Design a protein with these regions (language model features):
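Residues forming the Rossmann-fold NAD(P)(H) cofactor-binding site
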Residues: 94
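Conserved GNAT acetyl-CoA-binding A-motif
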Residues: 104-115
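Active-site acidic-Proline motif in GNAT/NAT acetyltransferases
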Residues: 84-86, 90, 118-119
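Conserved active-site tyrosine of GNAT-family acetyltransferases
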Residues: 127, 132, 154
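Acetyl-CoA-dependent GNAT
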Residues: 2, 6-86, 97-99, 103, ...
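C-terminal "cap" of GNAT-fold acetyltransferases
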Residues: 117-121, 140-164
């Protein structure tokens, strides 16, 4: 049985340690700028919101991001979603995505958005499967081993979620 719980600042090291279990994933996220210091800073920001996927009180996945409040209209920017290898392709990333809406709906959440590397096909499939629509491209945004990769912008309007 699993639980999805709100993450607290004390959870930052558990999340980073989970990523360190897979060196390829850790290398990828470091290319994106997620070192230990940046990761810790994210958890202590005033507008931080994250959810953890727990099995028997052991963290197996998470989503972290920022709550953006403009004139009491709430948006959420997903910065990182991660699932441990043993729990991938079992629907848990989708459960984390749907729980963002459930957790923030009481705060007048209107939109969830993110960016993803254009070569991250599994993530793109996850987002489109969960109703996120591509809204733009940042050309040559990421620099992976001296190769420029586009960033694709995706968003999900909450009114679309309510209709479906």
């Amino acid at each position: 049985m699993y639980n999805i719980n709100k993450l607290l600042p004390v959870n930052f090291s558990s999340c980073f340690d989970l990523m360190k279990l897979n060196q390829n994933d850790l290398k990828y996220f470091k290319f994106l700028g997620w070192n230990t210091e940046q990761f810790e800073k994210q958890f202590f920001k005033d507008n931080f919101y994250g959810l953890g996927l727990f099995f028997d009180n052991k963290l197996k996945g998470f989503v972290i991001g920022d709550i953006i409040n403009i004139d009491n209209i709430i948006e959420y920017e997903i910065l990182l979603i991660y699932i441990d290898n043993e729990k991938r392709n079992l629907g848990y990333a989708s459960k984390l995505l749907s729980n963002i809406y459930l957790g923030l709906n009481h705060r007048n959440l209107k939109k969830i958005y993110l960016e993803v590397a254009s070569n991250n096909y599994k993530a793109i499939k996850l987002y489109t499967k969960n109703g996120y629509k591509k809204t733009g491209t940042r050309k040559k945004y990421y620099n992976f081993t001296n190769k420029k990769i586009d960033a694709l912008l995706y968003e999900k309007n909450i009114n679309d979620t309510i209709k479906s």
